[in-house]
Amino acid sequence: MKDFLQKVNSYIKEAFGAGKYLYDGLSVTFDHLRRRPVTVQYPYEKLIPSERYRGRIHYEFDKCIACEVCVRVCPINLPVVDWVMNKETKKKELRNYSIDFGVCIFCGNCVEYCPTNCLSMTEEYELATFDRHNLNFDNVALGRLPTNVTTDPSVKPLRELAYLPKGVMDPHEVSSSDARVGKLPEEVYDWMKPKTNEMSDPAVKLNK
């Protein structure tokens, strides 16, 4: 009888544990069902990265003095600085500079500590490739400026906060019956119309 009661007690505990596990999972599901959809139709729509977004590193060869500060402050000693000493001028001559973005953690230390500001973080995040060796950028590839989301004619830029009603900063506070993030509210349309008309007016272009 004692063994039977122990089995029943163990079965009840396991049933309660399974029920709690199921409740936790469904509570998350139902919580998201009440939220506003924020689907972005990538790659035809892209969210504009934040002002301090840490994307692909941009490098200016002419500013670099081959001091190797970026190598010393990098947690994984990633940047490869190839230089030779000029015996006549007694100064370093930079030959090549490369960064492997397959290993880079985008911490931004190299940008922060660079004495000549030859390194900067860009908004580019589309670095996917079939061959990981293509992620090893030399000074020529690092020197290319990426296409900005707002200037790319093939992409519709999305400013996430601009799609929310006035005074609302959290998309979860908006009713699910309202328009999705991909549609502009009337207030933003009214704000954009004067600028669009100015750009399309030839008289305004001539005056400028």
Swiss-Prot record:
Topology within the bilayer: Peripheral membrane protein
Binding site for [4Fe-4S] cluster 2: 74, 104, 107, 110
Cofactor annotation comment: Binds 2 [4Fe-4S] clusters per subunit.
Pfam families documented for this protein: Fer4_7
Location in or out of the cell: Cellular thylakoid membrane
Keywords carried by this UniProt record: 4Fe-4S, Iron, Iron-sulfur, Membrane, Metal-binding, NAD, NADP, Plastoquinone, Quinone, Repeat, Thylakoid, Translocase
Top-rank taxon: Bacteria
Reaction equation(s) it catalyzes: a plastoquinone + NADH + (n+1) H(+)(in) = a plastoquinol + NAD(+) + n H(+)(out); a plastoquinone + NADPH + (n+1) H(+)(in) = a plastoquinol + NADP(+) + n H(+)(out)
Enzyme Commission code(s) on record: 7.1.1.-
Assembly and binders: NDH-1 is composed of at least 11 different subunits.
Family: Belongs to the complex I 23 kDa subunit family.
Function: NDH-1 shuttles electrons from an unknown electron donor, via FMN and iron-sulfur (Fe-S) centers, to quinones in the respiratory and/or the photosynthetic chain. The immediate electron acceptor for the enzyme in this species is believed to be plastoquinone. Couples the redox reaction to proton translocation, and thus conserves the redox energy in a proton gradient.
This protein's name: NAD(P)H-quinone oxidoreductase subunit I
The organism of origin for this protein: Prochlorococcus marinus (strain MIT 9515)
